[in-house]
Amino acid sequence: MSANDKSTPIPHDNAGTSRRSFMRNLAIAGAGIGAGLVSQSSLASGSTVCAGNVVSGQSRKLGDLTVSPIGLGCMSMSSGSYNPPRSAKEMVPVIRGAIDRGVTFFDTAEVYGPFTNELIVGEALKPVRDQVVLASKLGFKFDNGQRAGRDSRPVAIRKAVEGMLKRLQTDRIDLLYLHRVDPNVPVEDVAGTMGELIKEGKARHFGLSEVSPTTLRKAHKEYP
């Protein structure tokens, strides 16, 4: 790993108050995306109150993927990092409400929960899987349901992807990220494994999170 790589930990409850508040509000008002409000009480009752078609008809290019200009990051819907985790019964309608308002790009990760976030997102997106772009992330190992360090060995990546595909109820992940660099595994090994998964149809593209330009160039050289 390059000396310039930063290894920011996945945030927990001791994150800054302003960021915690932002993420809490995002989970509560996710379907509205600034166009309406979803109250705590309405979420608890399984209903949403929001209006407007915030991004319908608009799009951006992300490589050869076409996505809405606003995506929905689903982390705080279940992880408890910035607010108490919520149930699939509460969050599936929020995700589907975002779809109704033109959002087509959704982000999750195996570490969110862990695992429960992908279950929620998979359930919500299953009816419209071919109409949306799905991003998820890997790169950690787990012990008794808790994050226990990083692991991006090729065998670990392959095992993680099989679990992700099952939880997300899909046969491919459109954008597959390495969540954090594993200092014990050359990034070339990661890129090579991701490239194999793309060739096998289990992923369409891969990305790297929080890496230096040097690390990014090494990965790109291995699998452009």
Predicted regions and their residues:
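N-terminal twin-arginine translocation
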Residues: G16-S21, G32-G52
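N-terminal small/glycine-rich loop or linker at the start of catalytic domains
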Residues: G63-S81, A135-A148, Y177
